[in-house]
């Protein structure tokens, strides 16, 4: 399942590792593996690793961090803290379609932001089944990520 298991920038010299809590490992597995398309790595009965678009996330049983919509971006208040990923636009579009097909409830519907400006990007916010917010941004090229 999924078309994003291969996702990795050719120039990437390192990758990040992030560990956070989920309340149900099986629900989380289904979402990260079957909806997001992340390949599962090692696991025990209390945690599971995933290849999250070329980076490692570890989901551990526990209570997720409190989240509030306190991050202002343009006219929107977005969940803080949140996990985020940057993709190229074609991959972002494909993921948005996968999420819609899975009836994912969006915190912020897929949309373009800063249109026609440096750093133009597509963005969407959603939560995993345990309530952890995730933002995925899409750019036309890697060079646009840090434009100002």
Predicted features along the sequence, with ranges:
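Short secondary-structure boundary/capping segments
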Residues: 40, 48-49, 72-75, 115-116
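Core segments of cupin and vicinal oxygen chelate
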Residues: 20-64
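Vicinal oxygen chelate
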Residues: 15-23, 51, 71-148
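A generic structural signal for short beta-strands and their flanking turns/coil linkers
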Residues: 14-16, 46, 55, 79-81, ...
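N-terminal beta-strand motif that seeds the catalytic metal site of vicinal oxygen chelate
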Residues: 5-26, 82-83, 87, 138-148
């Amino acid at each position: 399942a999924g078309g994003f298991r291969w996702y990795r920038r050719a120039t990437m010299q390192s990758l990040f590792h992030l560990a956070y809590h989920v309340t149900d490992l099986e629900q989380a597995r289904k979402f990260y593996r079957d909806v997001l398309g992340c390949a599962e790595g090692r696991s025990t009965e209390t945690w599971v690793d995933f290849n999250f678009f070329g980076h490692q996330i570890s989901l551990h049983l526990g209570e997720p961090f409190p989240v509030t919509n306190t991050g202002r971006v343009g006219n929107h208040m977005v969940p803080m803290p949140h996990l985020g990923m940057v993709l190229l636009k074609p991959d972002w579009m494909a993921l948005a379609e996968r999420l819609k097909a899975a009836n994912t409830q969006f915190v912020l519907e897929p949309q373009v932001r800063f249109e026609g400006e440096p750093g133009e990007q597509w963005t969407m916010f959603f939560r995993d089944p345990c309530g952890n917010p995730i933002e995925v941004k899409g750019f036309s090229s890697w060079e646009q990520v840090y434009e100002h």
